[in-house]
C-alpha cells in the first residue's frame, strides 16, 4: 500500500513538472508556434506595405524570443522593413547583426546583398554615420584637393553633399568618408569586395581573365577615365562604338594594360573570359568609380 501511494505521488509530481515545462515552453515559444506566427504576420504585413505593423511583429519576436531559430529570418525581414521606410541606419544595423551573430546562416549571401545596397545609399546620402567625418572648406580649396586629402573622389563629394555645381566657399562643411576605400578581387569567385577601412561596404559580381590571365597581387589605381576609348590592337576605338569593350568607366592599375572597367556584354559577368582585366556591369563600375579614388589599393587573389 505504501509503495502504491509513493508511486502515485511520484507519478503525479512528474505529470505536474512536465505540465509546467509544457506551459513554460509554450509561453517561451520553444515549440515554434508563437515565433512562427509573428514571422508570418510580419510577412503578410510586408506584402501589403504595412511597414509599422510588420516591424511591431518582428520587434516582438526579437525581444521576447532571442534564442528562437527564426531570429536570422526576423533580422533579415526587419532590415527589409527598415530599408523600405528609408530608415537606412536601422536597416544596416539589422543586417549587420545578422551577419555578426549568425555567420553560417544560409541567409548570409542575401543579407550581404541588402547590406551593400544600404551601405552605398548611406555613403551617397547626407546622413552622417560613424563612417563619415566633416571637413571645413579652407581658403584656396577645390573639390579635387579636398577629395585627395580625404581619400575620395570629386563625384563622391558632389553626391554626398547634394552639390549641383563645383562651387565651394571657405567655412562650408562637407561630408567626407572616414577610412580609406580599397578593393579585393577574388578570381575563383568572380567577386569584387569594396571595403572602407576594415569595414565591409559591398560586393559586386565581376568577370576575370580567361586562362588565369588576371595577375595576382596588390596594385593601385593610377588612372580614372569616364567614357573611355579602347586602345585595341587594331587601333583606337572610341567610347560608344559597339566594338569598345571597356563600357562606361576605366580604372587602370599600376601594371600596364590591366584595370577595372565596364562591359559591352553583361552576359559575361560571373565568368573567367577577359584578357586579364576585371570587368563589371556598367551600373556597378559607375558606382565604384564614384567611390574609389586615385591611389586606392586593389588586391587580386586566386
Regions found by a protein language model. Name each.
Residues 100, 113-135, 175-200:
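Intrinsically disordered, low-complexity Ser/Thr-rich linker and spacer segments
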Residues 178-264:
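Gly/Pro-biased beta-strand-loop elements
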Residues 29-60, 64-67:
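Alpha-helical segment of the N-proximal tetratricopeptide repeat
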Residues 62-71, 99-112, 153-155, 159-168:
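Short solvent-exposed coil/turn linkers within tandem alpha-helical repeat scaffolds
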Residues 137, 141-159, 171, 192:
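Short alpha-helical segments in extracytoplasmic peptidoglycan/chitin-binding modules
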Residues 237-302:
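Exported/periplasmic cell-wall-interacting domains
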Residues 43, 65, 76-81, 85-89, ...:
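Primarily a LysM-type cell-wall glycan-binding module
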Amino acid at each position: 500500500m505504501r509503495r502504491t501511494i509513493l508511486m502515485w505521488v511520484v507519478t503525479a509530481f512528474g505529470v505536474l513538472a512536465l505540465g509546467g515545462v509544457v506551459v513554460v515552453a509554450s509561453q517561451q515559444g520553444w515549440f515554434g508556434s508563437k515565433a512562427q506566427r509573428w514571422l508570418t504576420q510580419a510577412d503578410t504585413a510586408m506584402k501589403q506595405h504595412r511597414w509599422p505593423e510588420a516591424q511591431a511583429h518582428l520587434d516582438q519576436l526579437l525581444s521576447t524570443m532571442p534564442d528562437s531559430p527564426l531570429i536570422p529570418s526576423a533580422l533579415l525581414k526587419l532590415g527589409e522593413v527598415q530599408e523600405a521606410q528609408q530608415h537606412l541606419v536601422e536597416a544596416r544595423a539589422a543586417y549587420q547583426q545578422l551577419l555578426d551573430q549568425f555567420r553560417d546562416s544560409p541567409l548570409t549571401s542575401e543579407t550581404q546583398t541588402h547590406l551593400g545596397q544600404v551601405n552605398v545609399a548611406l555613403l551617397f546620402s547626407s546622413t552622417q554615420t560613424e563612417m563619415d567625418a566633416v571637413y571645413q572648406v579652407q581658403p584656396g580649396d577645390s573639390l579635387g584637393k579636398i577629395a585627395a586629402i580625404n581619400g575620395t573622389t570629386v563625384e563622391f563629394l558632389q553626391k554626398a553633399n547634394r552639390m549641383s555645381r563645383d562651387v565651394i566657399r571657405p567655412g562650408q562643411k562637407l561630408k567626407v568618408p572616414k577610412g580609406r576605400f580599397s578593393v579585393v578581387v577574388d578570381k575563383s569567385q568572380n567577386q569584387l569586395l569594396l571595403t572602407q577601412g576594415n569595414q565591409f561596404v559591398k560586393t559586386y559580381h565581376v568577370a576575370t581573365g580567361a586562362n588565369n590571365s588576371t595577375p595576382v597581387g596588390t596594385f593601385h589605381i593610377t588612372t580614372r577615365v569616364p567614357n573611355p576609348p579602347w586602345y585595341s590592337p587594331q587601333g583606337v576605338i572610341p567610347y560608344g562604338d559597339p566594338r569598345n569593350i571597356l563600357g562606361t568607366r576605366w580604372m587602370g592599375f599600376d601594371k600596364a594594360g590591366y584595370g577595372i572597367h565596364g562591359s559591352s556584354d553583361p552576359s559575361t559577368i560571373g565568368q573567367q573570359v577577359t584578357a586579364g582585366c576585371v570587368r563589371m556591369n556598367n551600373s556597378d563600375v559607375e558606382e565604384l568609380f564614384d567611390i574609389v579614388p586615385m591611389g586606392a589599393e586593389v588586391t587580386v587573389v586566386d
